[in-house]
Amino acid sequence: MFNTGQSCDAPTRMLIESNCYDEALEIAKNAAENISVGDPQTDGTHIGPLFDKIQFDRVQKMIQVGLEEGATLLT
């Protein structure tokens, strides 16, 4: 068995052709806004919480670096 059903999905970038940029951005934004975080064993939950404070801090740092480098936080 490769894993126990767990995976880390934290892409750091998306490469999008300019002719479909606005549409792709809207699709990504809507998908993120509709993710349900909670108890993974509860129906309707898409992902569980971050594993621990170390992971939480790592994600917060990645967001901060992105903003400092000119990214826009959509949701």
Language-model regions, residue ranges each:
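ALDH superfamily catalytic-core signature
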Residues: 1-75
